[in-house]
Amino acid sequence: MSGKTFLVMAGGTGGHVYPALASALALREQGANVVWLGARGGMEERIIGRTDIPMRLITIGGLRGKGVAALLMAPVNLVRALWQAFSVFRKEKPDCVLGMGGFASGPGGIVACLTGTPLVIHEQNAIAGMTNRWLARGARYVLEAFPQTFAQAQSVVTVGNPVRDELAALPSPQERGIGARKPTLLILGGSRGALALNEAAPKAIAALPETLRPRVVHQAGEGKDQTCRELYASLGVEAEVYDFLQDMASVYANADLALCRAGALTLAELCTVGLGALLAPYPHAVDDHQTANARHLEQAGAAKIFQQDNLTVERLAETLTSLLGQPQKLLDMANAARTLAKPEATREVVKYCWEACAND
C-alpha cells in the first residue's frame, strides 16, 4: 500500500480539522504520503503547521452572512481557488482525495472530480454541510458520522467520527466509578468558550444543596477563565477553571457528567469514553446542525437537551439536582452514550481511502 499520495482537505473548525488529522496520521502509519489542503488564514494553518504534514494553502472563504460585495466577487474568488487547487493537484499528483469539510474542500473536491481523482468525503454532523452535499454526487465513497445524513446518496457508509486512540482505550463507565463516587461535572465551552454556559453553570451549581454539589472542572475558553473563576468565587462555589484543557483522556476519565455544546467532535468523544451529558446546542450553527447532533444522544438516553432560550439557571439547577441525586442515572446515561460509540471510525475512514485507490 505504500507509495500512494493522499490529499486531505479540512479546515475552518476543530470539528473538521481534528478528525481529519487523526485520519491523516493513520494513513501515514500505513505507509502513505499525506499532503494537507487548507484555506489561507484558517485555523488549519496553525494546527497543521505544528505537525510535519506538508500543507498547501488556497485562498477561499465562506459566503454566509457576507455583504453584497462578497457575493459579487464570489465567482472570481471561486475561479482563483479552483486554479490554485488545480496547481496543487498538478504538483502533488494525489492518488486519492479525502474531504472532511471546510472551505478548501469545495475547490479541492471539484478539481478531484474534474481530474478523475478518486474522492472520499466524510461528514461529521447529522446535517451535511453545503460543500459535502455538492461533492457527494461525485464521491467514490460518502462516509457519515450519523445514520441517514446522506439518505439519497450512493455508496454511503456510516462510520462515526474519528477520535484520539487514547480516548477509546479508557475503561468502561462502571470501571471508572461513575455512580459510585462523588460526581465530577465537566463543563466544556469549546476552545473559544460559550458565554451562556460560563454564566449559567456557576449560578445553577450555587443553587444546589451543599450535599449535592459536585466537583466542578470548567473549560471557560481563551481569555474567559478569570472572569468565570471570579464568578464562582463570588457565589461561594469551589471550581477548577481553565482556559483550555489539554489532557482530555484524564479529564474524561474522572468526569461523571458533562455540560457542553453539541459539536460533532465533542459528542463523538462523549460516546467513545461513555459519558452522559447536558447538551446546549449552539443556536447559530449552520442549519442548526448541533441540535440534530444532540437528538441522537437524547434518543438513546445519553443526554438531555437545553436550547439556548431555555438554558435558565432554574431549569439547569433542577436537572442537576435530579441527576446528581440519582447516581445510577449517571451510570445509565454513560452506558447509553457508549452504545453509540464508533471506536473504529479512524480505521474505517482510512480503509475506504485505500479502497478508493484500489478501485481506480
Curated annotation (Swiss-Prot):
Enzyme Commission code(s) on record: 2.4.1.227
Topological category with respect to the lipid bilayer: Peripheral membrane protein
InterPro entries: GlcNAc_MurG (IPR006009), Glyco_trans_28_C (IPR007235), GlycoTrans_28_N (IPR004276)
Pathway assigned to this chain's UniProt record: Cell wall biogenesis; peptidoglycan biosynthesis
Top-rank lineage group of the source organism: Bacteria
Residues noted as binding UDP-N-acetyl-alpha-D-glucosamine in the record, renumbered to the chain: T13, G14, G15, N125, R164, S191, Q290
Record localization: Cell inner membrane
Annotated catalysed reactions: di-trans,octa-cis-undecaprenyl diphospho-N-acetyl-alpha-D-muramoyl-L-alanyl-D-glutamyl-meso-2,6-diaminopimeloyl-D-alanyl-D-alanine + UDP-N-acetyl-alpha-D-glucosamine = di-trans,octa-cis-undecaprenyl diphospho-[N-acetyl-alpha-D-glucosaminyl-(1->4)]-N-acetyl-alpha-D-muramoyl-L-alanyl-D-glutamyl-meso-2,6-diaminopimeloyl-D-alanyl-D-alanine + UDP + H(+)
SUPFAM superfamilies, A to Z: UDP-Glycosyltransferase/glycogen phosphorylase (SSF53756)
Gene Ontology CC, one term: plasma membrane
Gene Ontology terms, MF aspect: UDP-N-acetyl-D-glucosamine:N-acetylmuramoyl-L-alanyl-D-glutamyl-meso-2,6-diaminopimelyl-D-alanyl-D-alanine-diphosphoundecaprenol 4-beta-N-acetylglucosaminlytransferase activity; undecaprenyldiphospho-muramoylpentapeptide beta-N-acetylglucosaminyltransferase activity
Alphabetized CDD domains for the sequence: GT28_MurG (cd03785)
Biological process, per Gene Ontology: carbohydrate metabolic process; cell division; cell wall organization; lipid glycosylation; peptidoglycan biosynthetic process; regulation of cell shape
Pfam families per UniProt: Glyco_tran_28_C (PF04101), Glyco_transf_28 (PF03033)
Keywords, ordered alphabetically: Cell cycle, Cell division, Cell inner membrane, Cell membrane, Cell shape, Cell wall biogenesis/degradation, Glycosyltransferase, Membrane, Peptidoglycan synthesis, Transferase
Enzyme class at the top of the EC tree: transferase
Function noted in UniProt: Cell wall formation. Catalyzes the transfer of a GlcNAc subunit on undecaprenyl-pyrophosphoryl-MurNAc-pentapeptide (lipid intermediate I) to form undecaprenyl-pyrophosphoryl-MurNAc-(pentapeptide)GlcNAc (lipid intermediate II).
PANTHER family registered for this protein in UniProt: GLYCOSYLTRANSFERASE, UDP-N-ACETYLGLUCOSAMINE--N-ACETYLMURAMYL-(PENTAPEPTIDE) PYROPHOSPHORYL-UNDECAPRENOL N-ACETYLGLUCOSAMINE TRANSFERASE 1
NCBIfam families the UniProt entry points to: murG (TIGR01133)
Family according to the record: Belongs to the glycosyltransferase 28 family. MurG subfamily.
Protein name, per record: UDP-N-acetylglucosamine--N-acetylmuramyl-(pentapeptide) pyrophosphoryl-undecaprenol N-acetylglucosamine transferase
Species whose genome carries this gene: Hahella chejuensis (strain KCTC 2396)
